[in-house]
């Protein structure tokens, strides 16, 4: 929302501080106090007149300039403070001894972070420091240290020689490129990692990239597939609303050091669209339906009524209707991209594909139970295999995640890795 974007843009200062600044500058002007360099008077000379209205306009402009200057000063000060890593190596525990440097740092961060308003989910994004670029020598040392257990002495000597050739050769040129990229990018590696490690991969997602999550295996809240599906779907929609309204609190280490919240943005309403050479991730801003798969058929299920999320009981009715009512992409990426272009370009196929790709997420109502037995580990292996692969055609592997529900009320999910 626009209001949240403005609040994030001025954090750590509260938005109300603008009106306080306007009141202070206006009061000083009409009280006869001269601003430094007579800036208010200089602004007034650029305006059409010197009436009370134009004087107030000049004061407002001056207040906005000072307010923005203070905000950016606070933000970049906080960014510099968050670059300090010494707190990681301090002692932990009740009788810990914390250095004076870290104590002063903690106090400064706390003062700047508590700016009078509660931070939204993305409030700290503009204050996070850039990912530091390590020198080539340090990178090579860490690489050699990481591979040493994998090689015998003869093989490791060859690797050392190759590393030395790389360090004395093209490494310097590549490092310069990374330095340039780090100047205009907050993270010099994330976009390349996403594209070249994930999106350019041509192997099927089913076992090469996607991962799965499993239910709390020692708990069984209900044996009803429709009821469990309805409750989890409703909970996911509430969680999505928290993200969209930025009401979810950012993660703070020790309640003070913020972590990046950017990845929350693509949890829902996101799909991976195949391409011949590289895929792309598409995120939709507003989606009011989900897609449910059951026994070879896909159902478009609306999850809102008059801008209200459906109650669990209302969703359960729809799930039960689907269960009582008497093909997904898993091929190689280039083949799927060509099929998508050829067969899903227009008409009903295009509309059906849009319904799936623009869904908040996908739900699979499986027609088998997910079983767990402490005395039979193979059942847990089968449970995980079902969530990871299904039958090969009953998961939409390109969606950000697919919720899977069994006939005995257990759940799990299959998630696409690149987002």
Walk through the language-model features, giving the residues of each.
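Long, Pro/Ser/Thr-rich low-complexity/intrinsically disordered regulatory tracts in eukaryotic proteins
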Residues: 1-399, 407-409, 416-418
């Amino acid at each position: 929302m626009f209001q949240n974007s403005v609040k994030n843009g001025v954090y750590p200062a509260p938005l109300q501080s603008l009106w306080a600044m306007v009141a202070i500058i206006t009061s000083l002007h009409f009280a006869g106090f001269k601003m430094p360099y007579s800036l208010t008077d200089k602004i007034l000379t650029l305006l059409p007149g010197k009436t009370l209205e134009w004087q107030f306009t000049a004061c407002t402009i001056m207040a906005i300039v000072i307010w923005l200057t203070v905000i950016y000063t606070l933000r970049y000060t906080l960014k510099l403070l968050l670059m300090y890593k010494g707190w990681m190596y301090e002692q932990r525990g009740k009788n810990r001894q914390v250095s004076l440097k870290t104590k002063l740092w903690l106090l400064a961060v706390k003062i700047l972070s508590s700016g009078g308003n509660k931070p939204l989910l993305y409030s700290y994004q503009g204050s996070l420091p850039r990912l530091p670029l390590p020198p080539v020598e340090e990178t090579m040392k860490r690489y050699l240290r990481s591979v040493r257990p994998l090689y015998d002495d003869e093989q490791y000597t060859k690797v050392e020689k190759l590393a030395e050739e790389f360090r004395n050769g093209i490494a310097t040129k590549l490092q310069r490129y990374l330095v340039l990229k780090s100047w205009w990018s907050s993270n010099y590696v994330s976009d390349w990692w996403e594209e070249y490690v994930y999106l350019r991969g041509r192997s099927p997602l089913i076992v090469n990239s996607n991962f799965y999550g499993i239910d709390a295996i020692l708990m069984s809240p209900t044996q009803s597939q429709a009821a469990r599906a309805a409750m989890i779907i409703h909970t996911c929609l509430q969680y999505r609303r928290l993200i969209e309204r930025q009401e979810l609190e950012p993660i703070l280490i020790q309640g003070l050091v913020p972590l990046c919240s950017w990845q929350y943005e693509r949890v829902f309403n996101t799909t991976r669209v195949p391409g011949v050479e590289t895929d792309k991730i598409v995120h939709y801003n507003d989606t009011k339906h989900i897609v449910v798969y059951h026994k070879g058929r896909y159902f478009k299920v609306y999850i809102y009524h008059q801008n209200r999320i459906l109650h669990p009981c209302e969703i359960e009715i729809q799930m039960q209707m689907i269960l009582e009512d008497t093909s997904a992409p898993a091929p190689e990426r280039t083949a799927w991209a060509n099929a998508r272009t050829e067969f899903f370009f227009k008409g009903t196929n295009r509309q059906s594909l849009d319904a799936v790709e623009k869904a908040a997420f996908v739900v699979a109502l499986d027609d088998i139970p997910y079983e767990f037995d402490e005395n039979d580990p193979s059942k847990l292996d089968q449970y995980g295999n079902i969530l990871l692969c299904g039958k090969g055609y009953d998961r939409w592997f390109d969606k950000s995640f697919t919720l899977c529900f069994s006939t005995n009320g257990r759940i799990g999910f299959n998630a696409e890795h690149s987002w």
